[in-house]
Amino acid sequence: MPAVVVVGAQWGDEGKGKATDQLGSRVDYVVKFNGGNNAGHTVVIGDEKYALHLLPSGILTPDVTPVIGNGVVVDLEVLFEELRDLNTRGVDTSRLQISAGAHLIPPYNRTLDKVTERFLGKRQIGTTGRGIGPTYADKMSRVGIRVQDLFDEKILREKVEGALTLKNQILVKVYNRRAVTIDETVDALLEYADRVRPMVVDTSLVLNQALDRGETVLFEAGQATMLDVDHGTYPFVTSSSATAAGACTGSGIGPTRIDRVIGVIKAYTTRVGEGPFPTELDGDDGEYLRKTGGEYGVTTGRARRTGWYDAVIARYASRVNGLTDFVLTKLDVLTGLEKVPVAVAYDVDGERFDEMPPDQSAFHHATPIYEYLDGWWEDITHARTFDDLPVNAQRYVEHLESVSGTRISAIGVGPDREATIPRYDLLSG
């Protein structure tokens, strides 16, 4: 059975949670391999809506083992808040496994994240202020705190002391904040040690053994391709690897283990925070997409920026991830439009780019070149086969498939769990 990676193919909020939830009933493990609680995904089951930020969406599916990999940064307070909320709603969370190598978000990094963003003013990146970036910076600077450190107070105290030597200088002398004490930080972290201990495993070993047994493992990316620290619109990106490659480094499996890579992509485009966005709409069309699509962040509540479908980005995401399939979401949001534009290339100072411009400056100044397709007015939320869709909706999907270069294997036509049209089997190909 396969290892399948699910990634966002735009700037996030594409509906990865729904896609992984759809596959979840057919897999044995669902693994979150990057990011933290800086992104959220919503899963609707019947009348219940679940907004998850740190936990893998597989936790909602009985008999599936949800895993938090070593590439994730964990806020323990948020972790246990989410677990408590799910428990009160009758969800069994006892199967959760967490990598001993995952890094922890200490309280001082949340503080640093918020004050740094305010300090940057107009140059701010648009972070969520949850300490994600500073914690990944600690990881790369080799002053980070890992889950396994909770079980040796001496090591934990030494690591906190080492980190605070510099961080207190910044807090006090740059931001005019009070110094953080070693004791308050250690106490805040140790509060969770006994509760988290039963969940901690060597996730690399667990996942490789599962694949050896022929079980199916699904890896879900946080954020998205265009927010990837290497391949996204740098510096307006997240701090982790949000492409398919991150599934390997963030969980401890080798690249030859991966069988399929699925990109989740909206029928239009959205973005939260700062950074370039070639197809962005500022007028009535943008507001229509925002209101009809409910485009407000699960984690922040911020209104998302909206724009038309961008095939240049879709082709780029397919290339850097090695996509085998697209899952197209929110097709129903486009119902009622007379014409639906699709960006197929960019114009940059009179030069046409059919692929992503090689430098960030050109991308900032890119003007989309559109093709226009006829819209449809029929309600498609109850469509369950491709033939149930209006002819113009079918043509739109087929056109996106053609200009994006990767087959569309499933189509989302509403928020409900069942509101999905399968075209090809995502697990077997």
Swiss-Prot record:
InterPro entries: Adenylosuccin_syn_GTP-bd, Adenylosuccin_syn_Lys_AS, Adenylosuccinate_synth_dom1, Adenylosuccinate_synth_dom2, Adenylosuccinate_synth_dom3, Adenylosuccinate_synthetase, P-loop_NTPase. Substrate binds at residues 298-304. Its EC number is 6.3.4.4. It comes from the Bacteria. GO terms for biological process: 'de novo' AMP biosynthetic process; IMP metabolic process. Mg(2+) binds at residues 13, 40. Transmembrane segments: none annotated. It is found in: Cytoplasm. Keywords: Cytoplasm, GTP-binding, Ligase, Magnesium, Metal-binding, Nucleotide-binding, Purine biosynthesis. The active site is at residues 13, 41. Homodimer. This is Adenylosuccinate synthetase. It comes from Beutenbergia cavernae (strain ATCC BAA-8 / DSM 12333 / CCUG 43141 / JCM 11478 / NBRC 16432 / NCIMB 13614 / HKI 0122). The gene is purA.
